[in-house]
Amino acid sequence: MLKGLRKKASILSISSTQSDTPANNYDKVLKQVRDFEIALQAMDFLLDDRTDEGTKLLQKEAQLHSQSGSDQPAGIFPLALGVMEFIEATLGFETEVMERANRTLSEAETASLNNSKYNVKYSLATSYIYPPGTEFQVTYAESTLLNALVMLLKENNGMVEGAKALFKLRRAYQTLDSVYKKIKDSEPIFNKNLSKLKKESLSNMNNISTSDLPGYKSNSSMSSNGGSSASLASDVKLMKDLEKVYQMRKGRIEGTNLGNNAPEKINFFEGFEDRSSNSSIVSSAATSTSNLSTTESATDNQLHVSTVDEFIHSGVQLCFGILQVVLSLIPPAIGKVLSIVGFKGDREIGLKMLWRTAITSRNIHGELALLCLLVFYDGPVQFVDVGFQLPGHEDSKVKDVLSLDGKTTVSESELKKILQNPALYTPQLLKRARAFFPHNALWLLQEGRVLAAQGELEKATQLMQSFTDDKSNKIRMQQVEALLVFDRGMFYAFQHDYDNAARDFVKLIDINSWSKGVYLFMAASCYLEKYRMIEMGLVDVEDKEKELRKYEDLAVKYFELAPTYVPNHGHNSTSKKQLPFDKFLLRKLRHLEERKRQYPKLKFVDLIGTSLIHELVYFWNGYNRMSEKDLQLSLKLLAYSGEVNAELSANSETASYTKIAESEDEAMIRYFLQAIVLRSTGKVSEGLSILENHVISKYVVADLPQFKFNKMTYSPYLYPTALYEKTMFIWILRTTHVEKLDVRKAVQESKNCLKKAEIVGEGDYELSNRTGMRMKAAGDRLDQLGHGH
């Protein structure tokens, strides 16, 4: 074997092209590159739901490093652990996990600074392009950014903590901006160098890239005199280490680095035939991608990009992309203050960076970018308002879909196309992730979310239920299990399967500490709705009275239990702060107590007005995901609490389900939700009429020439949200069934209405962040549409 390696080293005849680099640095360079590959492998273990294996790998390598006696730092290991803990923290939002991530990422910041100084001091050139220490500027920016996000997302952070987080964000922004400019300036050099390395690799007959050893070049043959035995032995060792690093990178890119079988060829368009009315998508996609690079040549490109350069590029793109998107989501009042000091975000630029990273990078940065995109587009909170779409640009009408398979570069025109219809591209990348990481339910959860966003609720719940029903499947990461169970519970609620929904919400008590009171309140609301379904005869039961008593008892049990889990309420004294939905449920229960005093002889379930679960469904974007059948059932159930003979009420003088008079405040909530349901069924004009006559007119007293409104407090989120939803009604009416579409006029009219929503929604109120993000998303989307015309 040694003889073979000697021969290989002789053939390659490695020699330095940079005389100012000390020879003993080459061992250190390869040691660092190997550390980076180890760190990337550890983070891949997390992506495959094998976090313990990843953590043990990092601990083992850190111990070996400390025992080696080397003065060379290993600053990548703390970052790898910090990234893993960051992902766990942001999946579950549990205080103790977030605090642990905060500590580790702070250590990673310090380690990165120290490693950067070391590389500069000893001129450790780990890149052909960037000066020594650049990679640890990136790890510093990454740890600073993730640390700032953890600090911002902690539920019990105060003003001081928030200020510290924003300061960290700004520091990360400055570092990333500096490195990003270097990357853009060096792009021609990088491409030229990649071509050169590929050419050298082909000519050396061994197809081993020397990209990880800056300062060396390969010659096709050795000189007739050969070299000294000492230099030859050194070359053999370098070649041995170089080959190990190459194989590590190769395994990571091909998906075999975790011991999993190499993923089979993935059909990126599988399922599109069923989910789109346009059957030509697959064939047209094949046409549109005929000139793209093949997977083999794409993999070849990846293998000849050094691990460090790959990390720098993907890390900067990911972090800068996240930063730009996060800053674009910050409410306008804070955003204006930050922009004064040159600190502002651009959502479109940020999303393009995330897409580019997710498509071209097979490492933690690529998969984290994909997760960000999936949460942004298909997550439970509406960060982007895809409802503002131009006629003819709907997903079902797009005939020319790009294939993302094997792409190592993405052009600006391709990114623009992807941003117009993101739902056609996230499933492609998700298929790849599921193939590379078959053991992680996180990717299955994301697939369920994508299916739900496409209106395939039944498929989504079947996928998620069958996974947990299979005893051979294990979910090691508790945060992922909690997310899967919560989302599945919401999807069941969207389908009016209230038994399964309530079961999932109650189960969350044992696996997640986010907001146990809210979980129980949701379960109680589901049991209440099942009670109403039985009362209205919408489900067949053998013994109606027995079933009514059963669901009444369950609803009362969990309504009474829910507030006992709310922090700092009653006897539950704790350092935790109440979350927005904790305040929501406490307000709802206060309303019930007031009605109990008003109607002392009525049963608890008869004191409740508008459907609580339907109100909660709105916050999780349920009406955009329901089928026509589910929407029609929602209309019937919402009518349960309506005043006798009122519009869209199920109650009349001869037959009535409700036992209490419907207050104006409760009627406003009911009509608001019914208007949204009507719009989702295609009855846009009717829905807008309901919204204006029964909701907005109750607090808007003047529209022209000056907008005036009365401040109402019964349901704080409702008043700005109703005006926000009116914006969507206006857009649909102005852009549908018109012979001559005036996009600019439609945008302006919609923005005028949105401005009124912002005026009504000024200040801090219950669920203000959620409402504010929706309005910000709508405003950004309208700006985008306006600039295009």
From Swiss-Prot:
Domain of life: Eukaryota
Cell compartments where the protein resides: Cytoplasm; Nucleus
Segments of this protein annotated with the region Disordered: 209-231
GO annotation, cellular component aspect: cytosol; mitochondrial outer membrane; nucleus
Keyword terms: Cytoplasm, Nucleus, Phosphoprotein
Family annotation (InterPro entries): Iml2/TPR_39, TPR-like_helical_dom_sf
Annotated Low complexity bias: 218-231
Main location group: cytoplasm
Subunit structure comment from the entry: Interacts with lipid droplet proteins.
Family designation: Belongs to the IML2 family.
Function according to Swiss-Prot or TrEMBL: Inclusion body (IB) resident protein that interacts strongly with lipid droplet (LD) proteins. Involved in LD-mediated IB clearing after protein folding stress, probably by enabling access to the IBs of an LD-stored soluble sterol derivative that acts as a chaperone in inclusion clearing.
Protein name as it appears in the record: Inclusion body clearance protein IML2
Top-level taxonomy: Eukaryota, Fungi, Dikarya, Ascomycota, Saccharomycotina
